[in-house]
Amino acid sequence: MRRVRGVGNLLVTILVVLIGFKQARKYCESNEAEFCRLTSLSRASPWWNEHIDPYWDSYVSPCVTKIHDYEHKLDEWAAPRIDRAYYQVQDIVETKVVPVTYKWYKTVQFKTQVYYNGHFVPFLGHARILAKQWLASEGFFQRLYLHVQQGLFCLRNWSLWVWNGSLEAFNEIHSWSGHALQEISNKFSVTENQSGEPVTDEDPSDTDESKYYDAEYFEGEQGDYNEDDETVYLTSTIIETVTLSDEKQLDKSTSAANGDDGSSLDVPLRDLVQDEFQAWSNTVEQKASNTLTQFDSEVEELVEAKLSKAQPNITGLLQGISESFQSHYRIINRAILDVDCTMELDPETGEQLYFNKDGTQLRKYVTRPLMREFFSSAHAHVDERLEMVRARLEKFVAAVNKEVEQVRQEHLEVYEEWGDVMVSEWSKRMAYVDVVAAMGAEDMNQQQHDNWKRFLKLKKQVVNTRDLLMQHPAKLERLQKFLNDIQFTLMALQRDAGEYLFILRSQANIAFQTREKLEREREEEERRKLEQERQIQEQKEREQQELAENEARAARERLALEQGQGQEQLEQNSDEAFFSMEDITATPLGADDNTDYENALDDADSQLSESGDSEDNFYDSYEGDEEDASRELERLERESAERETLDRLELGQRQKLQEEQHRDELHHSSQAN
């Protein structure tokens, strides 16, 4: 109906504009006022008078009159169709368009929030920190940034001041133009009333209606510029409309009332009883139909009051849950970034220290078990918080159902009390009528019998209404919609949390694989270096061993050579001594010769003793070289045993890492499935 009234008001506005323009044209035919120069198109342009006025009088004016005559018929014809089409469109929108749109809106909202908080916010925070560090290092740009910030602040304040001043000026111009237009319209209406000319050539009723529409037009114009007086004009319009439309009906009702006063002096008992019984039956039926309506209305008010209190709490709780999720996401993101770290040794304590890309020391080295602990904590937190919300919703629904049952019980008690009173009182009234009818002259037996049958039927109707009220389902569509929205929100939170944690788990796995690959490459490089050093050491040891063997061989050759030379010299000395002994025995010796002989014997003995000593020294040096060589061999064997032990430990660690990685992959694949 509001839309029909809007269409009707539009047509009335067009009609008022056309009639006002026509009146102004007639007024300005013999008037030279300044107002006529603005409103009369025939004076402003002769072309209008020559080409438009004939068609205006022939076609437009009759159409305006017909539109005015058929306006109420248009309302009667268009109102039901417009209402039916409006409610059909409204049902389609509420049942199909709104749920789907709301579902997609919630999905997009939560997805955007999750990815914004999970990806963009950490990146933005990191970029902000880098920008602050860069500004702190660059003094010129820092001063420039401060000057630009102050300039933008001053520009914003100046823009607000200019905007407020412009709004005040616009409001003043708007108010002044409204008052000016009101004064012009008042002058125009006063001039029209003083002119005494008829508005149209129609009957007086049309003239009154035209005046009414003129008043409505100017009241609407004034209401556009001054909203404070809108209620007064609408009230006056309604009063005038009621007066014009209901005058004849009021006269008819007054005459009918006067006629009833004249004829109601002598009412038969039959008619009086029948009227009272009809009134009572109408009351019972109306009460029966209103009871369910009142119950539904009170339940709706109760649910609305409960939701107005619970909805902000649930909304705040969901926001807190989302923020707590984001805190866990930030912890996991920080841990994923800290996977890529470097290790350094503390020069004082020799402890291993780990630093991230920013150069910040890590409190704890991030490992796969620690990352699994973070993910387990996040999953447990999500499940716990969502279960808490569901428990609170169940408690809220139980409280609402309890209060709804209390309202139902109150309505049942009130209706039962009303039914008992009405039935008992009306049964007494009917019994009294039976007594009076038996004493009177009228025959009312059949009528009273019919009334008692109707009374019994109405009594059963009261009882049935009571039973219907007990079983009538409460209209909790508003509560159900709220619960559906919350359930959808919880499902979206749980789904988004699972998806995002799966993404973070994949990122963490990639980060660990990258770090393990770098560690393997680093270990391979260290192993390669150790192998090269070991080969170099073995080559040096081999060279030293060969050198020692060569020296030992040379020493043995030198010893053999010296032994051979000593034996030859000993043989020569023994031969010379033998020959000298023969010479001595063959020739007689004097005192000097005896002395020389003794000296030669002493020299031979000394040479033999020296050769024996040199041989002993040679064997001693050879035995010392053999001991050094054995010690060197023992050292080489010990180093090779240590290298084999280190290789076995390294192989065991590598196998352990491979087994742990295999278990992680199996765990991830099982969770994904």
From Swiss-Prot:
Its main location: mitochondrion. GO terms for biological process: sporulation resulting in formation of a cellular spore. Residues 593-605, 612-629 have a biased composition (Acidic residues). Residues 503-568, 617-647 form a coiled coil. Keywords: Coiled coil, Mitochondrion, Ribonucleoprotein, Signal, Sporulation. Residues 530-551, 587-673 are annotated as: Disordered. GO terms for cellular component: mitochondrion; ribonucleoprotein complex. Disulfide bonds: none annotated. The keyword Coiled coil applies. The keyword Ligase does not apply. Component of the mitochondria-localized RNase mitochondrial RNA-processing (RNase MRP) composed of one single RNA encoded by the NME1 gene and at least 31 proteins. Absent in the nucleus-localized RNase MRP (NuMRP). This is Outer spore wall assembly protein SHE10.
